[in-house]
């Protein structure tokens, strides 16, 4: 339906929740096939013997329920601000409108026959929104003799795969319908690593370099989604085109590749798959950081319009933040102080000064070069 891009894209995501068409596992021999599995609700994950107990392996539900922003996703729709958006768009109650609940309370868009009675009325974005309908794998997924492949075959979404993880999250964290933007909905910027850290994480990463890897996969998937939307919005505002082209620029710098105009969506998705298929490493992170800090000359190019430069800088500083985090520097270290200045430079995009930013970026690059060799 024209003009309903968020709904169409995200309803595809919800449909995926309602029918994960994955192969049945011969090892687990579950009684319910993944395609027929129902959603059980967060309560099904909360027992002390599962994810509601104490300790690193059993405290996930407590972290999610007490600290994760997703638990408050539905509550956001009850605010005066949300009602103002809904009034502008004549949606009625935002807490009940599918235009809003598709991302803030996805269970509302799942057919009743796919939900067990244990599903909470106002769960927001809960366990199965990301992990998939649990009826076909809940009872056995914590058993020691069950492999990750067994769980995935039984219907659990493979969130260890960063490409799959990014695709699960991006549907509600990047694109907006034009009318929602016009009504005042906050702009969305997808940052897989940064937003995962802010949740905070209720899972363990086995690779200490997975953060930069997740960041890059997330950026590539974000470009894929932005390109998808712009192909369906021929009359998109210049702002959206600038955002897409800024992200494209950053990914070209990071990857060392030239992104083709004709196949940009395919290119960005393939980049995400390629990066997700390789283990993150110190060498890869250093190379990415070096490539991005060496872009100060780009911001001295007077032929590039200021709004596009501002959008480039906006994406760049977020990326530098995620990559610099791996160095575990003190807040008073020279690179950290210089990065703080770069963030200040992009606080007001209309007032962004490319030349000033270029100078500060060069200072940041020099501060990194002066780090002691013992530091990563």
Where are these regions (language model features)?
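Primarily the internal scaffold of c-type cytochrome electron-transfer domains
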Residues: 31, 54-88, 112-125, 133-317
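Short metal-coordination and nucleic-acid-contact micro-motifs, chiefly zinc-binding Cys/His arrays
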Residues: 38-46, 96, 123, 165
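Bacterial N-terminal signal peptides
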Residues: 12-24
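Short cysteine-rich clusters marking metal-coordination/redox-active sites
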Residues: 45-47, 100, 127, 169
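Post-signal peptide N-terminal segment of secreted/secretory-pathway proteins
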Residues: 93-125
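Bacterial N-terminal signal peptides that target proteins for export
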Residues: 2-14
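Extended, amphipathic alpha-helical scaffolds
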Residues: 269-376
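Short N-terminal segments immediately surrounding and downstream of signal-peptide cleavage
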Residues: 29-48, 52
